[in-house]
């Protein structure tokens, strides 16, 4: 059962990519009240067809069985694993794409096997993960299938199966940190004014374990650096690190302390009794990139921390309550000859979910929306339960839920951009939503790496906050910043929420899109005098990241200029289509 469900989920996310990125090869056929998805391969590669249980205007479709593959050998029924291979091998058949196909086949295979193992390991938890009350760490470790429009959302390129089980959140993992003593001349650290230093935070969390680690060290001035255990093993093979260890300038102290728990990003680690989280460097290929903290990204935590303390944010929050920023105000790493050693840098994030708040009913948005076979989504369960308790129709409760989501997400996220030019890559894994009595009441944004602003806004921001965004290289042209905000916050999170509500059968997407359109026009009237972002959200097409094409091109979305990190393309905008429907109603 778990193998079948994992293959079904993998095929679904792959076909969602295909429908979005290769629309000229896709047809939706309706016969006798049944909808069918048909994919025609180029260069006489045949076709693949299967039932479509739900077609979403936002791209979050649901598919059924059987799957039929037709080519020169005739038509035959294939299972989901065979269908995945056929799609990858036949969709881009050119010689130039061969390496990309091989890489994608391997990653998709890896992702599917991890989902299968996670479904098996967490089978007894799946119902509770869709319950009314879910803690931060439970939700973080309960995102089983991941990104619904990505060909390999759970690949862990570089990790063995045993390592994945030990270090991945899907297996409810927890493990102690690996520690290195670093000669203080090499140790590089910083923190925002007003924030605890990295050393202060570590001492608070580790207590006597710090003293035990330092006791056997040789005479000299050393600082302690926590490293992800998997990353530590890899870095010891690095010639620069190996030389420092051989010279006694870095000392491997082994694992020590209480277990830390990986969150949905795999590399960010949480402890319910610590006042901070650790965003580790992790040289593992996850979705579209290897997750290593870059020097400029360490400084973006200071940008967010300073902005959050400033009157600009305080005044904005009074106008748009509901959004909390979670900065990473401290960092540490190893610096030699003036350059950070990639792979050893650690960013330290404030932890609002500690102590009495560890059991707070909060969840990353992706886990709320995730639809699993035989279970559906937590979103659907919450709304069905509220409709039952309130004795109101499902569609009315779903609209109320979405209205509250518009208030706490769309207004502050896009309002901040319209007023101050600050964009956040607020996709569904970077947003944590707080639930009370079944409804969303507040949001937390994390991930300083995706916190930047455009050049036109820079003058006013730097006047209020000298140097803002400059050392962190967080100032970009308005066009690429618009593009990132449109994809991560609008397409991924907002339209993703529309699709999640629609595919649960709770309410029509057309009704939700009409609500969204009204909200965007209202926001534009209030804040949008100097920006065209709302017009772009209402345009006939949207600039959208193409995860399948990005993977076929073997691009790393965290490497290179912002403008060239991923493949982007134009997709049909469901909001524009809704406007046409309403205009002719």
Curated annotation (Swiss-Prot):
Sorted UniProt keywords: Plasmid
Pathway: Siderophore biosynthesis; rhizobactin biosynthesis
InterPro entries associated with the record: Aerobactin_biosyn_IucA/IucC_N, IucA/IucC-like_C, LucA/IucC-like
Molecular function (Gene Ontology), one example: acid-amino acid ligase activity
GO annotation terms (biological process): rhizobactin 1021 biosynthetic process; siderophore biosynthetic process
PANTHER family: L-2,3-DIAMINOPROPANOATE--CITRATE LIGASE
Family assignment from sequence similarity: Belongs to the IucA/IucC family.
Protein name (record): Rhizobactin siderophore biosynthesis protein RhbC
Species assigned in the record: Rhizobium meliloti (strain 1021) (Ensifer meliloti)
The organism's taxonomic lineage, starting at the top: Bacteria, Pseudomonadati, Pseudomonadota, Alphaproteobacteria, Hyphomicrobiales
